[in-house]
Amino acid sequence: MVVPLYVIRHAHAGSRSAWLEDDRLRPLSDKGWQQAQALAERIAPLGPSVLLSSPYKRCMQTLEPLGELMGMTVQEEPRIEEDSPLERSLAAIEDAPDNAVLCSHGDVIPGFVNGLIRRGMDIGEGPHALRKASVCVLHHVNGLFTHAEYWDPPSI
């Protein structure tokens, strides 16, 4: 049976260059909160099993509306935080339960997707870059990732 994992690039956050505090604490913008709510409404009917997020605030916040809608807690997954080594992020993906939703960063997701492609996963006509609040759906059978699809960010 083919089973999905939903990997979300965090929603829109304020400008990195304008943020003067620790970047881990940079929150979603108003647009980002709207995107997060739209993602929640799209993903909730799919019955996610668990919500896993980079510990960065913008990632945790991206999954908060989904958690509220589903009555689930967003769990931190440090192996998918920004600048995470490929081996660590790949292990997090491989360890994630079926139908999990994960939220990570634009520098991490392409790395493990490329790692899975090298292992034989087909991405078809995937995007050249993952936009904020986009979703990469990774399909696997018995732990072997077979193909992926890309969902554009919600229109806001």
Each PLM stretch: what is its role?
Residues 2-84, 122-123, 133:
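Active-site-proximal alpha-helix that buttresses catalytic centers in soluble enzyme cores
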Residues 5-6, 97-107:
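Generic beta-sheet signal
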Residues 13, 87, 108-109:
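Short active-site segment of divalent metal-dependent hydrolases/proteases
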Residues 45-47, 94-98:
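Glycine-rich phosphate-binding loop signature in dinucleotide/nucleotide-binding domains
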Residues 148-156:
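Short, solvent-exposed aromatic-acidic interface loops
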